[in-house]
Amino acid sequence: MAQTFYVNPASGSDTNAGSQQAPFKTITQALKVATIDTKIQLADGNYNASSGEVFPLTVPSGVTVLGNETNTGKGILIEGSGTYLSRTFAAQNVTFVLLDKAELRGVTVTNLASRGSGVWIESTAPTVANNTFTNCKREGVFATGEANPIILGNLFSENAANGIAIAKNSKGQIQGNTCFKTGFGIAISDTASPILRDNKIYENRSGIVISGSARPLLRNNVSENNTDDGITVIGTALPDIGSTNNLGGNTLRNNGKFDLQNASSNKLVSIGNKIDASKVAGSIEFADSSVPTPTPTPTPTPTPTPTPTPTPTPT
């Protein structure tokens, strides 16, 4: 049966019943007693080791942790880190682990630990919606294994490596997020194939970096005013940035080096995107007549090859 537990780090007690009148003090306690379809409602305040939290916070299948989605979690700060043993990347410093069909909504997450990740998603299909991820020492959200998350309407700012990292064979919907002032806005690697739609990415080192043999689909994203590139493609990656029957709709502009840099071994085909043909590098075919096919001279050989620093692949 669906139930709601309430948590207040200032007035609550973990010996309480977790009701609205007698809330728990910690998310940790609420997660211990939560069952499928449980909602955990958080009051404004700071949730950290000093208030009694034990990290990482693992949200069980079918459980929702809810703050305030209307302001993307302003005033509800969850800050901390604990060791999570990943099947694909060994020990990691993590604030939250989300199991299948878990939901995290309307909170602010910070992980100040070395190489710290805000949310870790491994071969599960949770929802991460309308949160703020800021000052994480690696990335806000990391998805790996066979993950298939929904990452929707979040704000990612000033995270050291990436806003969002999608690795291994992960898929998922990454929609309506804002990523700024971080290393890479979104990093996609290995054989990952997520759908990126309606994201706004600006003032990062590079906006979107696609590596390995990743095959993401990009539609209606804006990547602008990044120090290096709007989109960087390396390795054997081959993103879908538009087709005749499904136009890309991506806008790449005002980036420091290139709006679109293809340093991969594949030719990219761009259809229905807004890209300045004078700000591209590598093998790119503009298949719509609105943008002339660039003839770069000399042939662009990126120096140095854009390899992320810090590397978005955890060690």
What does each of the following model-derived ranges do?
Residues 50, 62-113, 249-252:
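Right-handed parallel beta-helix/beta-spiral solenoid domain characteristic of secreted/periplasmic
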Residues 1-28, 46:
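Right-handed parallel beta-helix/beta-solenoid
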Residues 42, 65-66, 102-105, 126-129, ...:
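All-beta strand scaffolds that present successive hydrophobic residues in beta-strands
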Residues 5-9, 30-51, 63-69:
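Glycine-rich repeat segments that build the extracellular carbohydrate-interaction surface of secreted
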Residues 95, 101-173:
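Right-handed parallel beta-helix
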Residues 51-54, 75, 82, 113-119, ...:
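Short glycine/acidic-rich loop motifs that flank beta-strands on beta-rich extracellular proteins
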Residues 27-34, 48-59, 94-96, 241-242:
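Short, T/G/N/S-enriched strand-turn elements that build extracellular solenoid repeat scaffolds
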